[in-house]
Amino acid sequence: MLWHLENRHTGATCFSKDEQKKALWDKAMEIAPENGVKVHHFLVNASAHRFFFVVEAPDYESLEATFGECKTLGEIEMTPVISW
């Protein structure tokens, strides 16, 4: 199943200078395969403080296991999608 994920945060809550917080994204990328999640695209619009992902995952629980800690870095919207 394909999913579109979007992380949104503000300039005031931006974590770009905080290596510990940035490491949460690295950890998510590392553990994704263990949770059955394949990251097809990880895209960033730095000036808008937005991260975009297209991932393949068997279910919502797999996404939570992969990206759950990243929810402390702003809002994450996880939407199931299909190819057009």
What are these regions (language model features)?
Residues R50-E56:
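Short cationic amphipathic helices and targeting signals
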Residues D26-K27, E56-W84:
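An amphipathic, aromatic/His-enriched active-site/gating alpha helix that lines ligand/cofactor pockets
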Residues L5-N7, F53, M78:
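A structural signal for short, well-ordered beta-strand segments
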Residues M1-E34, K38-H49, E61, W84:
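Short S/T/G/P-rich N-terminal loop/turn motif that feeds into the first structured element of a domain
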